[in-house]
Amino acid sequence: MKCKRLISIIMAALCLLTMSGAFAYKVGEARVAIGANLDSEQIAAVYSDFGIERGVIPEITVTNENERQYLEGLVDDKKIGHKAISCVYITILDDGSGLNVSTKIINWCTEQMYKNALTTAGITDADVKVTAPFEVSGTAALTGIYKAYEDITGNSLSSLAKMVGAEELIVTGQLAEYIGSDEATALINELKGILDITETMSDADVKKEIKKLADQYNVQVTDEQIEQLLKLCRQLEKLDINQLKEKLVSITNTVEKAMTAKDKVAKTVTTITEKVTGFLGSVSKFFAGLFNK
């Protein structure tokens, strides 16, 4: 009996080890997610952008149906289209490394938009490259990142978090068309930073808070955009607010640096314009003086 019991314990332990091994992943592990509607030449071009040979990294496929699972109803159907084109190369990084995102030939989703949406969805510590064989919105890439990350880790991300991440991506993108991508990202990050306050506020009070935040960034938002932001806020409140706030710090620093750089460029351009205007004015006065003599 003792022998049988010992064998049972050993077998159970082996099963546990096998199960944990099946879901173990390590730093440096990677996946490539390819849009299902690419032909062989386009796939070759994508791998060239990624700087790797096809077959070196495990590959998965993303379909338009996969994309619609998260984005349908959130964005104009034209943005989603009926084909999956954008592609992703994701590599797991050391704990605490954060998210690195780079894009190429993506004309709607920005790197910061992806980063924010992925953080909301629960993806951290990864290097993500997004590209396509020609210019596309890049919405399909979010689904590709989700699928690739889950394939690497062997664990499913929260369905709610993935849906909210997708909604955040779309709301940010739509807002960016009117007020600029940096401003849209910063505004939503500010909103995420006060979720512990907004969750106890009425819709009317949250709307007032959104208007205040918009004023801080010197941007105007319409009533429709405020409604969108309110809806996103209520969805974000359903997630782990403390985790979101912790992840927000590094992202906010990145956005602030981008906005500071933009301000410096704007001030430099203004200074140059003023100097050129002043110079031309001086030249004009000089010649005017010559002709008046």
Short names for language-model regions:
Residues 1-10:
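Bacterial N-terminal signal peptides that target proteins for export
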Residues 119, 124-219, 224, 231:
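Soluble oligomerization/assembly scaffold segments of membrane-associated complexes
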Residues 31-60:
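N-terminal targeting signals for Sec/Tat export/insertion, comprising classic cleavable signal peptides
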Residues 10-18:
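Bacterial N-terminal signal peptides
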Residues 69-125:
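Signal peptide-directed extracytoplasmic domains
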Residues 18-26:
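Sec-dependent signal peptide cleavage junction
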Residues 29-30, 92-101, 122-127, 169-170, ...:
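Acidic/histidine-rich, surface-exposed loop or edge segments in extracytoplasmic proteins
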Residues 219-293:
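Charged, long alpha-helical assembly modules
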